[in-house]
Amino acid sequence: MKDNRDYIGYGSKDFSFEWPNKSKLALQFVLNYEEGAENSILNGDTSSESFLSEIVNAKPIQGNRHMNMESIYEYGSRRGFWRIHKEFKRRNLPLTIFGVGMALEKNPDVCEQIIKSDYEVASHGYRWIDYQNIDEQTEIEHTILCNKLINKIFGYYPSGWYTGRTS
């Protein structure tokens, strides 16, 4: 296998960049919305989720549900989104939602608040799964499905794309 990584980058050259209006700091607030799209036998997967949780060294449970893992993910849709949404509305702050298509499908109330709040929606994929070993055609289909789904729900195609898992 040929190593084609870039180990040099800018090297010794200084990188100079100036933000508009000579600003010193630019912030973007992003909320990942993934709940319900993770690995689960309820979604037709062979095992439960094991990625990004408070469970140290979590292992997928084959052929069965992982109730602790599901509870951790469900917190985001049941309380997490609403607490963050309330605070952002109180402070009149803009927010970008990195929305996973299947997760958005499962919670119309969250989608309604995203619309009412005029939050920007970027695609975070159709499923919250590791795509590294998924065939290319399925990944393409999921990309198209998610884009169409976001357009159907929000009336526009996603403003951007961020795949948060290996692809």
Per-segment meaning from a language model:
Residues 2-167:
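Catalytic alpha-helical scaffold of carbohydrate-active enzymes acting on polysaccharides/glycoconjugates
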